[in-house]
């Protein structure tokens, strides 16, 4: 696994984007709901930037909103992590 998915927050972002595209604020709200705490915008957008720079997430503009989606590479990495995690839990 590359270092870009070693962060729990980045993995969670990829998991939330699996199968759907989300506006940044909706994505941030879902993460905050899952974590049970507020996420600093700088931290959230920093994680998105790393994922986009590494080719795991792509952005498109829809009106005035940025919409994020998982790329094929991001989906592959997420499935690799899921497979690894499943193997660990079966042991």
Regions found by a protein language model. Give the residues of each.
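Short, Lys/Arg-rich nucleic-acid/phosphate-binding segment
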Residues: 7, 61-67
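Short capping segments at the starts of secondary-structure elements
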Residues: 8, 17-26
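Short alpha-helical "packing" element that flanks the helix-turn-helix/winged-helix DNA-binding module
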Residues: 9-14, 44
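DNA-recognition alpha helix
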Residues: 25-36
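Short, hydrophobic-biased segments on the C-terminal half of alpha helices
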Residues: 45-50
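A short, conserved structural fragment
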Residues: 52-60
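Amphipathic alpha-helical dimerization/coiled-coil segments
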Residues: 81-91
């Amino acid at each position: 696994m590359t270092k870009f998915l070693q962060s729990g927050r980045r993995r969670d972002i990829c998991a939330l984007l699996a199968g759907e595209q989300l506006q940044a604020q909706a994505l941030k709200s879902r993460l905050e709901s899952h974590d049970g705490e507020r996420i600093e915008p700088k931290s959230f957008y920093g994680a998105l930037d790393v994922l986009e720079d590494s080719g795991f997430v792509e952005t498109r503009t829809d009106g005035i909103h940025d919409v994020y989606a998982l790329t094929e590479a991001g989906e592959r990495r997420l499935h690799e992590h899921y497979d690894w995690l499943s193997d660990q839990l079966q042991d």
